[in-house]
């Protein structure tokens, strides 16, 4: 899953350089969604890892 996120990040950077339109705009949108998903997963794993084990 992380490899897909990196792939879409690279595509989004190329799209930003060339201008957002068509497939480039779609790739940038997917990259933004993946960024938010991974950010939420990071925060959840950070909070769960800090809890004392019972």
Curated annotation (Swiss-Prot):
Ranges annotated as spanning the membrane: 4-24, 28-48
One Gene Ontology CC term in the entry: plasma membrane
InterPro entries from the UniProt entry: DUF1328
Primary residence: membrane
Alphabetically ordered keywords of this record: Cell membrane, Membrane, Transmembrane, Transmembrane helix
Subcellular location field: Cell membrane
Membrane-related topology note: Multi-pass membrane protein
Annotated family: Belongs to the UPF0391 family.
Designated name of the protein: UPF0391 membrane protein Pmen_0080
Organism the protein comes from: Ectopseudomonas mendocina (strain ymp)
């Amino acid at each position: 899953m992380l490899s897909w996120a990196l792939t879409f990040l690279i595509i989004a950077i190329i799209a930003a350089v060339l201008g957002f339109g068509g497939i480039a705009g779609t790739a940038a949108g997917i990259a933004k969604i993946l960024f938010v998903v991974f950010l939420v997963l990071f925060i959840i794993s950070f909070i769960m890892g800090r809890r004392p084990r019972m």
